[in-house]
Amino acid sequence: VWWDADEQRVLELGTFPSFMQFSKAVKLDMVCKVKTVACEWIESYGMAVGQEVFRTVAGIGWLAGTIGTEVRLVPRKAVKMHLCQSMRAKDANIRQALIDRFGVVGTKKAPGPLFGVSSHYWAALAVAVYAAETPVKDGEFWIEDLRKRSII
């Protein structure tokens, strides 16, 4: 989700089924022009995780190394607290909080500021809004900072 914090509206939505398709996409140029990319960071809840989680973490690292701009890793807990003031918030609560704040999604003939947002884009939009509205906090990381420390 490309979010314009000044105009408070979605500029673009995009899904890439693979890392290679992302790197070849025209939208990569758009991503490289932004100052910061915010990504939801994977958190441990003490449960066993599957291959999908490891692929996601690898993908975040790949993205950070590819785009050449700052990457802010945002924990989901922080997004929940910012938008819903509750750690128990679910996806439906986050979606409703975004609609309450920015207005209806709208239709093709009368698009709202969130027009086109559906499914997993709600979570991505929540991360983008959080990153645009808050300073970096403990528990969040900047990939740039890690590069400077030679961890990545």
Enumerate the language-model features and the residues they cover.
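Phosphate- and other anionic-substrate recognition elements at nucleic-acid/protein interfaces
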Residues: V1-I152
